[in-house]
Amino acid sequence: MKKSISLIGMAGAGKSSIGKKLANYLKFELIDSDQLIEANQNKSLQEVLVENGIQEFKKIEEEVILSVEFNQTVLATGGSAIFSKKAMNFIKSNSSVIYLEVSFEDIMERVPDFSNRGFIKEDDQTMEHAFNERESIYREFADHIVTNNEGLESCFNKILSVI
């Protein structure tokens, strides 16, 4: 196992919740890139997105990720981190990357309203199209794919079995 773990996946996949549990169990530092963006910008993710636009938001997210110092770290990434190959290559070279796979139906049940999540998608893009677009990218960068459809404890145990 690499000395750090990064969790990737859609908004609502459980990255922050599972990241917290993993970090506590492994005695690693938890870094949540969404929280770092909010702290650095002193605004919510949605405010950062609305005020800066998609391209600038991606740049801010990339800079935050590239600033992470991996040392026994669990990184819970924002759902759009995968749009920066530079950031994802940095993550992959410094950690084991785990894709928390969740079906589109489950994501929509967990997060019925994305309007305040700082979720990046084109105006004319449906949520399902955004989900499908991201899924192949998550798979491309993942060292391990763990399905999170049976609850937090089950997903946590699956991760422990692959790291």
Set out the residue ranges of the language-model regions.
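P-loop (Walker A) phosphate-binding loop of NTP-binding proteins
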Residues: 10
